[in-house]
């Protein structure tokens, strides 16, 4: 069957609209729960030869400091994904209500498929979380975790990674001024460590200082694009790039699209990756 040029172009445009994000070596620096919304997530761990396809309107949990290749395919752009962070307040509560005999869990990703009734409940919970105060928010997130069959394993994963890591401390310093082009020596000095000691500690986490810097700057760049009316030149400057053209190049390599197309093609208005 012959396909007209117009039909081929329409098909190509549809495919382009459906491709949301393509992230290589994505690192979740915090324990997170993601509601997929109108997106399909394809997640791979090349080191462990594992692959997961998580359909739209589902939940999944990613453990802190784990490495993934991730593709997000937008099926319904009017229904963006949502990211919920497991913060320190919730971790503190989990410590207070959990027994001391928590065990190590090797698995680092958990999924939950939702029926129609559960989907309605989860949607309401996520909306409530956004507008709730800290105490109410904590219990809403706990309720959200209860939709996972592996709830106990997830709690153990969260507790096992609850201590502040060297990566957390590095991120905290960098985010004091994301417009600054931090050097390893700047950060190690502020942490009262030698350069070599900090480098070794990051190597133990399979990370480099350069990788963390890139992830933090790209996270904030995507946030500025989606939550402000700042232009690309302004955003480039805010995240520490002296050249807008170089910022666009780096952004495109990271997110597989240009900053200009990022908002137009991807209706991801809640949460951000990384």
From Swiss-Prot:
Keyword Manganese: no
Short name of any one Pfam family annotated for the protein: HTH_18
PROSITE patterns: HTH_ARAC_FAMILY_1, HTH_ARAC_FAMILY_2
Keywords: Activator, DNA-binding, Plasmid, Transcription, Transcription regulation
UniProt KW Ribosomal protein keyword: no
Segments forming domain HTH araC/xylS-type: 168-265
DNA-binding region: 185-206, 232-255
Superkingdom classification of source: Bacteria
GO MF: DNA-binding transcription factor activity; sequence-specific DNA binding
Role summary: Could help in the transcriptional activator of eaeA expression in enteropathogenic E.coli. However, it seems that it is PerC which acts as an activator.
Protein name (Swiss-Prot/TrEMBL): Transcriptional activator PerA
Organism: Escherichia coli O127:H6 (strain E2348/69 / EPEC)
Underlying gene: perA
């Amino acid at each position: 069957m012959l396909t007209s040029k117009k039909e081929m172009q329409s098909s190509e445009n549809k495919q382009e609209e459906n491709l949301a994000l393509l992230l290589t070596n994505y690192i979740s620096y915090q324990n997170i729960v993601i509601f997929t919304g109108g997106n399909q997530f394809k997640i791979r761990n090349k080191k462990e030869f594992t692959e997961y396809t998580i359909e739209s309107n589902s939940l999944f949990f990613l453990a802190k400091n784990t490495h993934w290749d991730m593709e997000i395919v937008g099926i319904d752009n009017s229904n963006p994904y949502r990211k919920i962070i497991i913060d320190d307040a919730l971790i503190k509560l989990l410590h207070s209500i959990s027994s001391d005999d928590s065990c190590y869990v090797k698995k680092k990703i958990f999924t939950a498929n939702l029926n129609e009734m559960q989907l309605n409940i989860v949607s309401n919970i996520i909306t409530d979380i956004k507008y709730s105060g800290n105490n109410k928010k904590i219990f809403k997130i706990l309720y959200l975790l209860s939709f996972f069959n592996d709830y106990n394993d997830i709690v153990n994963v969260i507790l096992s990674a609850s201590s502040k890591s060297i990566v957390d401390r590095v991120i905290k310093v960098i985010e004091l001024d994301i417009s600054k082009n931090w050097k390893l020596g700047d950060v190690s000095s502020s942490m009262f460590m030698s350069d070599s000691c900090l480098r070794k500690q990051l190597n133990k986490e399979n990370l480099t200082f350069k990788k963390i810097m890139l992830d933090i700057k790209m996270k904030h760049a995507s946030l500025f694009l989606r939550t402000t009316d700042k232009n690309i030149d302004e955003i480039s400057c805010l995240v520490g790039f002296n050249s807008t053209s170089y910022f666009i190049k780096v952004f495109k390599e990271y997110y597989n699209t240009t900053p200009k197309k990022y908002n137009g093609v991807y209706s991801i208005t809640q949460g951000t990756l990384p």
